[in-house]
Amino acid sequence: MEENLESIEGYVDHIIYRNADNGYTVLVLVCNEEEETCVGVFSDIAEGENIKAKGSYTEHPTYGRQFQVKSFEEKAPQDEVAIERYLGSGAIKGIGIALAARIVRRFKADTFRIIEEEPERLAEIKGISQRKAMEIADQVNQKKDLRQAMIFLQQYGINTTLAVKIYKTYGLEIYGILKENPYRMADDVEGVGFRTADEIASRVGIRTDSDFRIRSGIQYVLLQAAGEGHTYLPMQELTQRASRLLEVDPEHIEQHYMNLAMDRKIIMRQVEDSTQIYAATYFYMEANTATRLTQLNAVFDVPDIEIEDRIRKIEKKTGMDLDEHQVEAVKEAVRNGVLVITGGPGTGKTTTINTIIRYFELSGEDIMLAAPTGRAAKRMSETTGYEARTIHRMLELNGGMEGNAGFERNEQNPLETNLIIIDEMSMVDISLMNSLLKAILPGTRLILVGDVNQLPSVGAGSVLKDIIDSKMFPTVMLTKIFRQASTSDIIVNAHKINRGEKVSLDNKSMDFFFLKRYEADKIINVTLQLIKQKLPKFVGASEYDIQVLTPMRKGLLGVERLNTILQMYLNPPSDRKKEKEHGAIVFREGDKVMQIKNNYQLEWEIRSKYGLCIDKGTGVFNGDTGIIEEINDFAETITVNFDEGRMVEYSYKLLDELELAYAVTIHKSQGSEYPAVVIPLLSGPRMLMNRNLLYTAVTRAKKCVTIVGDDTTFEQMIENNSQQRRYSGLKDRLLENKEEA
């Protein structure tokens, strides 16, 4: 409570640490000749400044007594010594210690009034020109403007970090914007979404039926829908959702569609008797994706006999023996600009890709391989013997925020290659596909490989399914389970699940087990025993490599509860391990964690065993997993070691982007492969507990699947082939392009 806060006042003697991104600062404040260590977020601070800070004293286990600053205000230096100290501190560029002394000697206690009201008089001092006098005055006034803006914004509950971003975006315009249309901030300022803007608007006194509020709310609903996988919403559904969110009558919502369309914030498409409404960004992503795929869909005239002769040479050299569908896939790859290869586990996708690679190598063609995630790319490299990268790295990510990634490879700087093969295509959303296609020159062959029966991408769109369903591009479906794969019950049962067939649960398998338990606590106890005692020896992997996959986030067997229990079991508290509490989560050194949103600006580096940086880049992505190496309370950072040794430093302000990953949702596991998976299973919502979800979970395991739970739920999931509909228009756009061609 504000009334319980203490106040201290003094000057900043020196700054120990400052994070320029979020304003977190550790400084020493001299108060009545006593030094106080102050810790907090400061919008703008410099050595020599006089401040009054409100907060409370705490005892840090390592650094001792500190004053935790909740708010502060700048105080004008009251005497000539304080004025000289401030001016000579470096806070004002161009004024050093000697010049500060001359200024104060000339103007004494009147110095700040002279700078603010009669800055030209500074030129009376030797070493200061009229131009320099104006520059000094500008700096002083800018700092004053920033402080006043901070006070203004904070009265509406805006924290210091966000207030700085807002001020940097609008400057002195912020006063008018906040009182007239705070919803502008949701468009312009990263970190201010509709919910934040709406809260500010409520405090400012904006009406709930304000035009600005309704338009911003409509855009927010479309953004939320994209998070659910939709690229558009039917008008009726959009109206209903927006009406519930805003608590405004539906007719008031519909009145604003045309204005938003005229401002090009949304795009409205009439398809038969339905109106589809897109956020403009997703409309153009779909349109561009359809256009560029159509442009790549060339036909190359290569005789059958020539292709077959080369395939035989490759088979003889490698010892591979292709079936008729695999041969067909190679032929289609040679003859077409775009090819889709799809099939379940053990159906020979890897053999087919390897043959295609060797075919084009014999022609001296340049080849690029990529996949959506680091794990998938690594697996692709291991199975082909050819370098594979993430799509982001192939496109040379240059940083940007979620939904606004920048790539060095684009229309102006395309990829220089003859063939691109993308694996795990079911994970690729419309945004990434759009960026990929922008960087591909016409004449380049593109092969898309994936399992269409897995869960769709986390991001918006149904890219792989729409491409296949359009029937515009040759698609080879591999269905034969090869001899080596047919000995694996993981693969055999995955295909049975996919076909809706009964799976034997007699546990006579060597890699697929079902342990029947019907109560959540008993399921959890068995899961703990498997991870800690039985599976590490059985599969020859560490307990950290065994992944718990669960259908839901909430509930008795949800991710949140399981992670708390698994953390206590696998990485309990220890005097040797530092912790950081963040909301309901306690992060601990040694914890397994996952990035839960794309952050294209986060920097990473790979270090040698001597600690030297041998590679670096930007971008950590939704689903990336790693281990917490270090928690640094002084710097307020957590360092995570991700796959491939990428070290990433998170400020405490970014911890919303991390969560524990001992257990993850099946959806989040897409594109990953683990030595062993454990799937705790009880009943859940019918739309979620379906065949598609179960199939995806089972196919994540390389050596062993163990399902612990209710066999009736397992059988119901196999029978349930219903899937939640995704609103995606790529198929229609492709067909429209075909008609126009």
Go through each PLM region and give its residues:
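Accessory, non-ATPase domains that flank or precede helicase/AAA+ motor cores in DNA-metabolism machines
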Residues: 1-306, 315, 741
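Loop/turn positions that initiate beta-strands
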Residues: 48-50, 590, 623
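The Walker A (P-loop) glycine that initiates the GxxxxGKT/S ATP-binding motif of P-loop NTPases
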Residues: 91, 124, 343, 371, ...
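N-terminal pre-P-loop "Q-motif" helix
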Residues: 319-335
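Conserved RecA-like ASCE P-loop NTPase motor core of nucleic-acid helicases/translocases
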Residues: 339-381, 449, 512-519, 534-555
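Conserved helicase motor core of SF1/SF2 NTP-dependent helicases
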Residues: 355, 359, 363-365, 374-383, ...
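Conserved helicase motor core of P-loop NTPases
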Residues: 452-618
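C-terminal accessory regions
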Residues: 615-618, 622-741
